[in-house]
């Protein structure tokens, strides 16, 4: 099974460690790098719709996300492929995901709060005929909303099967977890203590001061909104699992000392992940 991982310079080292977590189980992995996509780069600074609101496309922590729709073409529109974000790691052999496959479906993914999640997709590439350049063009022509793109509702022809969340486990590890997704960006273990470098979305000035007030009054508040630095992951099992994979990748020379020091120097990762 071929694995396609989306990435960019900010998440490149993490994506290599993610790749290692799959390769150790004998799978083929290919990285899809934003910096290598001329189609995406030409839209930097352009406007697009996200939940009906205008946003500016920037090369930030998640500039790679549209690349997930390129993977079937890269695989010559054949075979089953697994497409994932760079912050997803194989805790156990993901080959069991193939037990869900039958010819009735084009795509398999998880659902949270009744919303389909495209950060992990098992795609029957021979059934998918996405025109990547057309999709991106329509995104920046406001014909497709980013929210609809990510939730897969932009393509009503898709036959989608919802599979168990153990294949996209959000920030927790259980005995059943196959793929761990460190989806809460503020607690990604390789970023701990670094200055936050992503758009918090709902972090308006009003929300910021509202949560500061709540904290002062001893009320329940949203820590993510008022933090200026990446925080330690609250789940020790997740933290230890990610550290172990990073250390294994380093020990087996899958990531080099030069790559590590470059990432630390540019504040793409925190040296704490190796301590």
Residue ranges and their predicted role:
Residues 71, 107, 118-122, 160-162, ...:
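Conserved hydrophobic/aromatic beta-strand scaffold that supports enzyme active sites
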Residues 66-113, 122-123:
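GT-A fold catalytic core of metal-dependent nucleotide-sugar glycosyltransferases
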Residues 21-28:
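Short, acidic, metal-binding catalytic loop of nucleotide-sugar glycosyltransferases
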Residues 1-3:
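Extreme N-terminal starter segment of soluble prokaryotic enzymes
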Residues 99-153:
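Conserved catalytic core of nucleotide-sugar-dependent glycosyltransferases
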Residues 10, 31-33, 42-46, 129-275:
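A glycosyltransferase accessory/donor-loop signature
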Residues 30-74:
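Active-site-proximal specificity loops/subdomain of glycosyltransferases
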